[in-house]
Amino acid sequence: MANKPRIGLILVPEHTNYGAQLQSFATQKAVESFGCDTEIIIYKANKSNRNVKFYWGLIPWFIKRLLASKVQDRYKGLDEVHEKNHQMRKAASKVFKEKYLKNIRICNGYNELVQAGQSYNAVLIGSDQMWQPGVAFGNFISMRFVPDGVRRISYATSCGVSKYPKYCYKSSKDMWMRFDFLSTREEQGKALIKDVCGKNIKVEVLADPTYLLSKQEWEDCIPTQKMLKEPYVVCYLIGNDVEQKLCAKRYAQHKGLKIVSLMSNESVSPVDMNFADINIMGAGPEDFINWIRGADCLFTDSFHGLAFSVINEKQLYVFYRHKSGVSVTK
């Protein structure tokens, strides 16, 4: 019997965002359904390594660090309640990763990353916002560690933005031109790649990995649990728009339903603790799915809030997320 193809996966399994973890799970599940062995690669960069060989001037280096710091800063300024929620979400995410994601390979430093790259038949990246501006300057997301002869694949990878700054064009073009199969999650991502690389580059637009599993397959993987006896609506708003939350409250009152709020760990608004009948802190991805399954409808500004409402055939109301230091496409 021939050996199964070995596929390295570049995902976001350690993020506290529900969508990031659930699409990591779905991607691994889908790839393995094709008869492949998978390994999720987690890269722990060694700060003493000087291994970025291309386009690594002082300005790109500074911008890359600045972008990274902004991601970390989204959690600064949380009050005591929201900080507690954030820490509980981190713990729940760790439990989910250990329970549902398998074959995780931690690479400490660039040399271990190179060794990992040599052990695969292909390396696949996707989905979420992996292609933020500046990632091509590094070694991991750019797949610079992947040797010739190992296929580079992106599945529905999101850029998270509609345009790149000009300083990113050359490195990003070199990164994308090396892919054997290139796809993104949004039409704007396809347009961005063609703008950077030229109109002749082949880019597909594919569905988010969470859609690769059917409602029944999600049920088989994460069994349904009844979260509340009374009828309710779920409010899952990552942003901090007060009027959106009050809109959900008015709807629930009009329909005579309880309103359940899955508390955001990325923003704070003055009504967070008093607009809902039930505030859920520290919910993990399993709880996220099950609260949606049992709801009459969902109010959300989240891509994956929308996705799991569609998968579970739920009525929903989708808001545009006002920028509050976080992305608007998750």
Labelled PLM ranges:
Residues R6, L228-V233, L257-K258:
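Charged active-site motifs of nucleotide-sugar-dependent glycosyltransferases
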Residues I7-Y18, L22-D174:
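Aromatic- and Gly/Pro-rich donor/ligand-binding loops
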Residues L101-A122, W131-Q132, F137-G138, A156-P231, ...:
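A nucleotide-sugar donor-handling region in carbohydrate enzymes
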Residues A116, M175, Y251, N290-W291:
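Structural alpha-helical scaffold elements that stabilize or flank donor/cofactor-binding regions
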Residues I125, T184, F299-T300:
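Short beta-strand scaffold positions
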Residues A156-G160, L237, Q244-G282:
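Catalytic donor nucleotide-activated moiety binding site of glycosyltransferases and closely related
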Residues V203-Y211, K215, S264-D301:
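Donor nucleotide-activated moiety binding/catalytic core segment of transferases
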Residues W291-K330:
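A donor-sugar binding/catalytic signature common to diverse glycosyltransferases
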